[in-house]
């Protein structure tokens, strides 16, 4: 069975709208595994982790995004992501 990203995104958005954040996290995790360069999904996933109090997981998602931006030459975006991380964990 092939992965339908559009359907998964729609399902995840529905879960967020319903306040079912843990279910949304699971959907976004599946999407992130299927497309590891989708920084929008990773950012949304990180934001959801923050919302449910899983700061460590959020930082992991945001670090992945920052590294992607660094490797692709988008240094200002990488710095912005690192600033987002520093707000979650000032140390």
Segments (PLM) and residue ranges:
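Repeat-based scaffolding regions
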Residues: 1-91
């Amino acid at each position: 069975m092939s992965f339908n990203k559009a359907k998964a995104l729609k399902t995840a958005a529905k879960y967020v709208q319903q306040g079912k954040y843990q279910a949304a996290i699971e959907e976004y995790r599946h999407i992130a595994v299927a497309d590891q360069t989708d920084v929008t999904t990773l950012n949304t996933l990180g934001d959801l982790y923050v919302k449910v109090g899983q700061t460590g997981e959020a930082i992991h998602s945001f670090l992945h995004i920052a590294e992607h931006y660094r490797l692709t030459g988008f240094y200002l975006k990488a710095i912005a992501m690192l600033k987002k991380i520093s707000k979650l964990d000032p140390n």
